[in-house]
């Protein structure tokens, strides 16, 4: 009997889940609150309650070769980093190519998801939905939650004494759409994440004054990396990951900080993280350093107190006559349709095995797709998550015991806290995490075997960027075009930029990218031995 799967949300996680259910012979039904697919990437001029929202000028932070669905490369002429409308175009192309739209019920709200009385034996769920004021109930063999984590804005007003006295306007960055109304205004942006930096940089060209207040600082990276290549094509590699995880901590931290400071010294710009060794996801902004250098954006410490029209910072300085306060303070994740006892949260900690499965469930028929954050792109991550989840739901890939899953969660949590800090406990190392998931379903590339049988491909897989195609080389859902996609990925990267041909477009030397850090590390270790 074919298993029926309810999928909540038709963003990238939902589409990946629909597609992978179909590949494995399951029967998906996707419930989408809005009128279209795309989730976060579907721009709207107005904010809808219960839906993710972006501003008009949002661009991707991951390049196209690292962002695509693993068997559906972006068209050659698409830019490497793209406007949200361009990514939405690609998402629509994917959904139509894979014939996914007919499995989606639009304008449908999921009201509740509850275990059936016989859940211990069947693993089934009662799902109640609402459309046009009419409620319906249906039974599903499994549920995949794909509603994202950019829905419920976090506005910690209790952390800012006097904010209730402030007479200007204050709102969350989720409500920001475009800069027009801020012309000639004085704006305080609280938060140094991607949204805060994007908004501050955009407003700096039209507002009278823009200040960013940051409690802990952040690394700020450019999308343009060494020799002009996209940052992630050089930064996210298997060899880079190997070095990062095997070198002595003092060397690894030193090299990481050197990479982060390669473009500019963060101390000089007031951006340096309080704990500079944490591997928190950096901010991606090509404009902010120039805005600071030109004096059109100012960085300040945390706000100590608000008055009726001013903000007093912890260093004693005051920003007066503020018109707007924008809280770019992130989001809280919540599942209002689900009993809290199923997915427990401790502080900012989610109790999910590999960020997907709640360990205590008697039957592993509930999966959360797209909650985990990593330095890698969301699309390939959610694709691999849903591939594994589908195998678990089918019963072909059993989970470990509850005890083993909880031990794994606790072990990983300790490592995450050390690497990323307490506020980013759903963050994880991209390559390590992807390999873990891939190994569960036999989709992890066998690097030693590749070097023996296909050295040309092996060099690209190990020393080149860890592109999504690598996870469709083998295993269920393997793609015959994966090898060629890997060997031609640099051609697609260069294609949209060669609009004025001057000589031959140059691909990077893979060995040069890793030889330098190895050499520096060896010299550093030798120096430490000599000195101590």
UniProtKB/Swiss-Prot annotation:
Entry GO CC: endoplasmic reticulum membrane
Keywords: Endoplasmic reticulum, FAD, Flavoprotein, Membrane, Microsome, Monooxygenase, NADP, Oxidoreductase, Phosphoprotein, Transmembrane, Transmembrane helix
Record-annotated membrane-spanning stretches: 510-530
UniProt keyword annotation of Cytoplasm present: no
EC main group: oxidoreductase
Residues forming coiled coils: none
Binding site for FAD: 9-13, 32, 40-41, 61-62
Catalytic activity: trimethylamine + NADPH + O2 = trimethylamine N-oxide + NADP(+) + H2O; N,N-dimethylaniline + NADPH + O2 + H(+) = N,N-dimethylaniline N-oxide + NADP(+) + H2O; hypotaurine + NADPH + O2 + H(+) = taurine + NADP(+) + H2O; (S)-nicotine + NADPH + O2 = trans-(S)-nicotine N(1')-oxide + NADP(+) + H2O
Residue list for modification Phosphoserine: 401
Keyword Membrane: yes
Record-listed NADP(+) binding positions: 60-61, 195-198
Any Pfam family: FMO-like
GO MF annotations, alphabetized: albendazole monooxygenase activity; flavin adenine dinucleotide binding; hypotaurine monooxygenase activity; N,N-dimethylaniline monooxygenase activity; NADP binding; trimethylamine monooxygenase activity
Protein EC: 1.14.13.148, 1.14.13.32, 1.14.13.8
One example of a Gene Ontology biological process annotation: taurine biosynthetic process
Subcellular location, record wording: Microsome membrane; Endoplasmic reticulum membrane
Annotated membrane topology: Single-pass membrane protein
Cofactor: FAD
Signal sequence coordinates: none
Disorder: Defects in FMO3 are the cause of a fishy off-flavor in cow milk due to by an elevated level of trimethylamine (TMA) in body fluids.
Family, as annotated: Belongs to the FMO family.
Chain's role: Essential hepatic enzyme that catalyzes the oxygenation of a wide variety of nitrogen- and sulfur-containing compounds including drugs as well as dietary compounds. Plays an important role in the metabolism of trimethylamine (TMA), via the production of trimethylamine N-oxide (TMAO) metabolite. TMA is generated by the action of gut microbiota using dietary precursors such as choline, choline containing compounds, betaine or L-carnitine. By regulating TMAO concentration, FMO3 directly impacts both platelet responsiveness and rate of thrombus formation.
Protein name: Flavin-containing monooxygenase 3
Protein's organism: Bos taurus
Lineage start: Eukaryota, Metazoa, Chordata, Craniata, Vertebrata
